[in-house]
């Protein structure tokens, strides 16, 4: 669990840094930097974090990593990232206000709580879904082949 905490929180710190820097440099929340750019950056960060977590698990296991162990490590990392990133965005919306959500499609037509709930569910479920995909692929390549 220590590995998942370490790498999941590192991914979240990268996301926090991206959000803070990009909102300072590009204040318009409708800019493509906040949509497409953030999506690409966050997914690459998530992929790298999952890879490093699974690779660390393999090193700690003296090079003997099973597919199941790699998958569990990657999913635990994705869960830590999903929870901590959701908490960060909750604090950000409560402190900055709903203008942080201005770039979300349809957010201007919904009450703030509904737009925020949709964003949190998307972030949480999306992080777990992509974490499953990334962990599966990474574990497939890093796991020790089973002998018959």
Task: Give, region by region, the residue ranges found by the protein language model.
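Membrane-water interface at transmembrane helix exits
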Residues: 22-26, 54-58, 88-93, 134, ...
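Hydrophobic alpha-helical transmembrane segments
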Residues: 111-134
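Hydrophobic alpha-helical membrane-insertion segments
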Residues: 74-92
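Short, charged juxtamembrane terminal tails flanking transmembrane helices
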Residues: 1-3, 139-148
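Transmembrane alpha-helical insertion/packing segments
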Residues: 1-57
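Functional transmembrane-helix hotspots
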Residues: 87-109
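Membrane-helix interface/capping segments
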Residues: 52-70
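Hydrophobic cores of alpha-helical transmembrane segments in multi-pass inner/ER membrane proteins
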Residues: 45-50, 127-137
């Amino acid at each position: 669990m220590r590995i998942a905490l370490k790498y999941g929180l590192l991914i979240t710190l990268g996301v926090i840094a991206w959000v803070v820097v990009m909102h300072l440099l590009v204040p318009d929340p409708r800019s493509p930097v906040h949509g497409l750019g953030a999506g690409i950056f966050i997914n690459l960060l998530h992929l790298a974090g999952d890879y490093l977590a699974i690779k660390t698990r393999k090193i700690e296991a003296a090079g003997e990593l099973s597919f199941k162990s790699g998958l569990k490590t990657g999913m635990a990392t994705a869960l830590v990232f999903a929870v901590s990133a959701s908490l960060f965005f909750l604090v950000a919306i409560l402190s900055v206000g709903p203008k942080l959500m201005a770039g979300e499609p349809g957010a201007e037509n919904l009450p703030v709580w509904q737009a925020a709930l949709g964003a949190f569910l998307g972030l949480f479920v999306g992080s777990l879904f992509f974490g499953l995909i990334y962990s599966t692929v990474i574990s497939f390549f890093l796991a020790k082949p089973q002998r018959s």
